[in-house]
């Protein structure tokens, strides 16, 4: 059966209810020692089971000390959860009885373990990811007119421990603008020298921050939706777009998501990722992210100099990852490489060879392909990004360029999901 067969996506084994969302992309730092970080986050659908994903990108162990979570019916002050009547919602203690393992709720051991030690990573570009236990917590209907469901997560890092957190200092402020975030709220607050987890009321003089405690969340959705997982470099991340996050994956996912069919985005595009980094990270996280559709970059400008060997390797890795996604129950989509500045004529030929392989594969009916090259190229040789789509560095698109890329990939994702 071809991936182009519309019935394929309806028969995929993964069409279950687990969704995965990642909130920050790219950067990591040490959590504030003896401090509490609290986050207000949104997900696409109602949930009744939820767990947190934590990561470690360093050569030393990382310790998650103590975490609580709670649903909230509205943003309130960003740190104190409320129900629809305006009354306080009790926090739930997050446990790690399964020692970070990826297990179903029924296989989770009983107990009261509230900390997790994450082993050292062998490669900073492929962090170790581990899970909290599944927590039986139900989302709340919004009381403020919002459509998405809101979650608050709070983590305390003790003096004796170390913990790694994703962060984005330049992102969170513009991400507060509704026109930018499209309702996908990410807010962060910190209070130093206080444990606001063991005693939540102690978290009473917080200030805005830029760290997000969990790397990602997974939840059992109530609606037959989808997780869109994407893998690539800074172009996949959306670098040089609004808030550096409004790239084609975000635009595509949010345009396709609806209450009847929520689409949750898991973006693994990172700045500076080489082909080897993209490959290693995808190998580690394709199955973990529980995808329904998985998009893979087939080339990156970070592999320098471009050669026939790098072109062949990039392509072979992409098709291997596509098959890995298929085995995991997802429909794979390959992304053709866009033009960028600095390539010689010979190097441009290598890039175009990957474009042509992807188009040939799509024409044969064996693979879905989103041809981003055709949307952004000026048609020259060597090609460049069309001026109206160039952010100014000759490599990354601007917002109009990312919108053009989203216009290409969105119908392909729609086809994969049979929407």
State where each predicted segment sits.
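Short, surface-exposed beta-strand/strand-loop-strand elements in extracellular ectodomains
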Residues: 62-75
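Beta-sheet-rich sandwich/jelly-roll-like modules and their strand-loop junctions
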Residues: 4-62, 193-195, 200-220
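Serine-esterase "nucleophile elbow" of acetyl-processing enzymes
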Residues: 7-17, 183-184, 189, 193-269, ...
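Structural recognition of the beta-strand scaffold that forms the well-ordered cores
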Residues: 227-237, 263-269, 292-298, 325, ...
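Aromatic- and Gly/Pro-enriched, solvent-exposed loop/edge beta-strand patches characteristic
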Residues: 73-171
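Oxyanion-hole/transition-state-stabilizing segment in secreted/luminal serine hydrolases
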Residues: 237-240, 248, 275-316, 337-340
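Active-site segments of SGNH/GDSL-like serine hydrolases
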Residues: 297-303, 321-353
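Catalytic His-Asp segment of secreted/periplasmic serine-dependent ester chemistry enzymes
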Residues: 339-419
